[in-house]
């Protein structure tokens, strides 16, 4: 098996290096990742400047682009040979609930899905036990690879920041919800000009049993299938009825 590994925290982040080291015990691995932190880049592509992949001595690449750029280039450009699976992570911090809208970690996996490959995104609910998340991925891949990895979906995995032996198990979950985002942070720069920072993530609003928030909070690895189709199917009929009523008066 040949695995393409990417992330949004950047090539030099601890999470991706720990993940690649563990995956190389079970597969051939090549990293193609951003050359710096690209957190919250979502699925953005770079269209107004050239992308410059830098080939490193060990065969990996870092790119002056977004996570989606990295996977797009790797699978649709310069990377030769067959790739069987895309794994994105390990993200420093969870990607649960509404986080998935912004996540560059998920975006890298979704780009792999868009290009026809099964893909996994993995995040750690903290910044300490990356080796736990890496072991979780290596434990799941042989079980998932041939059966449940649909090229039209990705698997989103969130791991509690615990020792591997302290994990309570795995739970298949839906996404939870966060409350409205916190206010932006207003400051003054050294020139006394006003600047703003995006505030921290809001607290969970729906962390009921069955959600990814609930699972991770209670020591379980959450596993959530994610699709790119954003259609609200439950609203199609009501919108169709509204359209017919409003325009047939």
Curated annotation (Swiss-Prot):
Names of required cofactors: a divalent metal cation
Coiled coil: none
Residues given in the record as a divalent metal cation binding sites: 8-9, 39, 91
Keyword presence, Nucleotide-binding: yes
One GO CC term on file: cytoplasm
One function term, GO molecular function aspect: exopolyphosphatase activity
InterPro entries membership: SurE (IPR030048), SurE-like_Pase/nucleotidase (IPR002828), SurE-like_sf (IPR036523)
EC code: 3.1.3.5
Keywords: Cytoplasm, Hydrolase, Metal-binding, Nucleotide-binding
Location in the cell: Cytoplasm
Superkingdom as given in the UniProt entry: Bacteria
Similarity-based family: Belongs to the SurE nucleotidase family.
Chain's role: Nucleotidase that shows phosphatase activity on nucleoside 5'-monophosphates.
Stated name of the protein: 5'-nucleotidase SurE
Organism: Haemophilus influenzae (strain 86-028NP)
């Amino acid at each position: 098996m040949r695995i393409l590994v990417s992330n949004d925290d950047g090539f030099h982040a601890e999470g991706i290096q720990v993940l690649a080291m563990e995956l190389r015990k079970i597969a051939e691995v090549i990293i193609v990742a951003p050359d710096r932190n690209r957190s919250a880049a979502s699925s953005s592509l770079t269209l107004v400047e050239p992308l410059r992949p830098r080939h490193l001595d060990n065969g990996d690449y870092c790119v002056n682009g977004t996570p989606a750029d990295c996977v797009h280039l790797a699978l649709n450009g310069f990377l030769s040979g067959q790739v069987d699976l895309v794994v994105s992570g390990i993200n420093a911090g969870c990607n649960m609930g509404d986080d998935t809208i912004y996540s560059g970690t998920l975006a890298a996996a979704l780009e792999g899905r868009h290009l026809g490959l099964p893909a996994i995104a993995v995040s750690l609910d903290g910044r300490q036990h990356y080796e736990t998340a890496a072991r979780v991925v290596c434990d799941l891949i042989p079980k998932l690879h041939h059966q449940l990895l649909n090229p039209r979906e990705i698997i989103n995995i969130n791991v509690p920041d615990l020792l591997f032996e302290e994990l309570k198990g795995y739970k298949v979950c839906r996404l939870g919800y966060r409350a409205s985002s916190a206010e932006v942070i207003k400051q003054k720069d050294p020139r006394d000009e006003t600047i703003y920072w995006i505030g921290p993530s809001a607290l969970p609003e729906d962390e009921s049993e069955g959600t990814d928030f609930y699972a991770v909070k209670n020591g379980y690895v959450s596993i959530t299938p994610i699709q790119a189709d954003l259609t609200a199917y439950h609203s199609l009929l009501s919108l169709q009825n509204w359209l017919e009523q409003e325009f047939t008066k």
